[in-house]
């Protein structure tokens, strides 16, 4: 049966992504001096204004104003004409320390039964997802959408298309036969630009020099693919001048483009004690290893935690009818192989390292440089599950 699925992405200059990057740059600055920093940093961006709030408890000495200016300048916000001037924008610091009530649960000073163990930083549910649609074990529509805005940013930074500005959004619709992507049926691409080029020039350039080269490796474009390029006809006003930005408003872009479920918690600006982030990374790690181990074609992992408790209150594995062993046996293997305590997740995925700003654009998943994208548990999973395999051999 033919079906369609659509996902979107946004550029590094999108106002919400500007905020995500500032929040994660603050986190990195803290972790680089104090790996045990407790950070929950939120950023708000509006016309000529960056406001940084949240809770930060750290021994690090950081300059929030300079961090915000550096991030904005790196993106390309160096003039009010393009949406923000990093040098002249106002930066307000409204941060304060983490609540001691939360801290005692995180650091093992809460209820006696959990004494001495790192507890989850909050309650919540987290999901991880993996599938065989792409080499990255990610949904094809989202990876295509990321590819368009990432390639546009590369051309902009290299000045190969000199009239490009930082703000942009993409959206890609993929046609499926079953769970197999067969073609791209539509591409929506809105790219901020200087006022000088004509719409005809903009449309032709964006299609021929950005969209087609970015998506050509997929082999999914065809003569019937429809292109919707800057559909309003003009996109000169962008960035925080055009739209307010806020940390954590692009959680679907950050994860699976809507194909996998989301627990609701955002990632950027949060240290690894916040299971919204760390457990979502672990859930992806588990799901990807299950699919890479050929135990299922598609897999979704749900974890749930209670604040201050040093282990998950639930684990659920969903394989959408594609498993080569029972889900109960896969779940048992996961419990045996993966350390799902907050402290264990941090150790396994090296989450005290200051690498978070690079996660804040083009998705937290499907990018091989991150530890949660490793497939180093494949053999362990295969050994644990092979005796219980259903019809069809589990590949080595």
Swiss-Prot record:
CDD domains linked to this entry: S-AdoMet_synt (cd18079)
Residues holding Mg(2+): 16
Cofactor: Mg(2+); K(+)
Reaction equation(s) it catalyzes: L-methionine + ATP + H2O = S-adenosyl-L-methionine + phosphate + diphosphate
Keyword Metal-binding: yes
Record GO terms (molecular function): ATP binding; magnesium ion binding; methionine adenosyltransferase activity
InterPro entries: ADOMET_SYNTHASE_CS, S-AdoMet_synt_C, S-AdoMet_synt_central, S-AdoMet_synt_N, S-AdoMet_synthetase, S-AdoMet_synthetase_sfam
GO BP: one-carbon metabolic process; S-adenosylmethionine biosynthetic process
Pathway assigned in UniProt: Amino-acid biosynthesis; S-adenosyl-L-methionine biosynthesis; S-adenosyl-L-methionine from L-methionine: step 1/1
Record's subcellular location: Cytoplasm
Binding sites annotated in the UniProt record for ATP: 14, 167-169, 234-235, 243, 249-250, 266, 270
Cross-referenced Pfam families: S-AdoMet_synt_C, S-AdoMet_synt_M, S-AdoMet_synt_N
Cofactor note as given: Binds 2 divalent ions per subunit. Binds 1 potassium ion per subunit.
Annotated spans, Flexible loop: 98-108
Binding, K(+): 42
Keywords: ATP-binding, Cytoplasm, Magnesium, Metal-binding, Nucleotide-binding, One-carbon metabolism, Potassium, Transferase
Keyword Metal-binding: yes
EC identifiers of the protein: 2.5.1.6
Subunit comment: Homotetramer; dimer of dimers.
Annotated family: Belongs to the AdoMet synthase family.
UniProt cross-references to PANTHER family, sorted A to Z: S-ADENOSYLMETHIONINE SYNTHETASE
Protein name per UniProt: S-adenosylmethionine synthase
Origin species: Treponema pallidum (strain Nichols)
Organism ancestry: Bacteria, Pseudomonadati, Spirochaetota, Spirochaetia, Spirochaetales
Gene this chain is encoded by: metK
């Amino acid at each position: 049966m033919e079906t369609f699925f659509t996902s979107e992405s946004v550029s590094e200059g999108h106002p919400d992504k500007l905020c995500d990057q500032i929040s994660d740059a603050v986190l990195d600055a803290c972790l680089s001096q104090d790996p045990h920093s407790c950070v929950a940093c939120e950023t708000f961006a509006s016309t000529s204004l960056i406001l940084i709030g949240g809770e930060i408890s750290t021994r690090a000495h950081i300059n929030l104003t300079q961090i915000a200016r550096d991030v904005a300048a790196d993106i390309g916000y160096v003039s009010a004409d393009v949406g923000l001037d990093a040098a002249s924008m106002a930066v307000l610091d409204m941060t304060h320390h983490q609540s001691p009530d939360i801290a005692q649960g995180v650091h093992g000073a809460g209820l006696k039964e959990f004494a001495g163990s790192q507890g989850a930083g909050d309650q919540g549910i987290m999901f991880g997802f993996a599938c065989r649609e792409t080499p990255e074990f990610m949904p094809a529509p989202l990876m295509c959408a990321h590819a368009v805005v990432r390639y546009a940013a590369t051309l902009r930074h290299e000045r190969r298309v000199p009239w490009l500005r930082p703000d942009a959004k993409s959206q890609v619709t993929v046609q499926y036969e079953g769970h197999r992507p067969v073609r791209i049926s539509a591409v929506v691409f809105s790219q901020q630009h200087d006022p000088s080029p004509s719409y005809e020039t903009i449309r032709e350039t964006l299609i021929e020099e950005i969209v087609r080269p970015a998506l050509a490796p997929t082999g999914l474009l065809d003569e019937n693919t429809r292109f919707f390029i800057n559909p309003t006809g003009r996109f000169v006003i962008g960035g925080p001048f055009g739209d307010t930005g806020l940390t954590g408003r692009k959680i679907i872009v950050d994860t699976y483009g809507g194909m996998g479920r989301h627990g609701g918690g955002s990632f950027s600006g949060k240290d690894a004690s916040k299971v919204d982030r760390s457990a979502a990374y672990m859930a992806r790690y588990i799901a990807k290893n299950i699919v890479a181990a050929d135990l299922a074609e598609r897999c979704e992992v749900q974890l749930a935690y209670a604040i201050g408790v040093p282990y998950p209150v639930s684990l659920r594995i969903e394989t959408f009818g594609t498993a080569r062993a029972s889900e109960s046996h896969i779940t048992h293997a996961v419990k045996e192989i993966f350390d799902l305590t907050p402290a264990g997740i941090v150790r396994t995925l090296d989450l005290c390292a200051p690498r978070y700003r690079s996660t804040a654009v083009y998705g937290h998943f499907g990018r091989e440089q991150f530890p949660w994208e490793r497939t180093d548990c494949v053999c362990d999973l295969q050994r644990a599950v092979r005796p219980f395999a259903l019809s069809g051999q589990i590949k080595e």
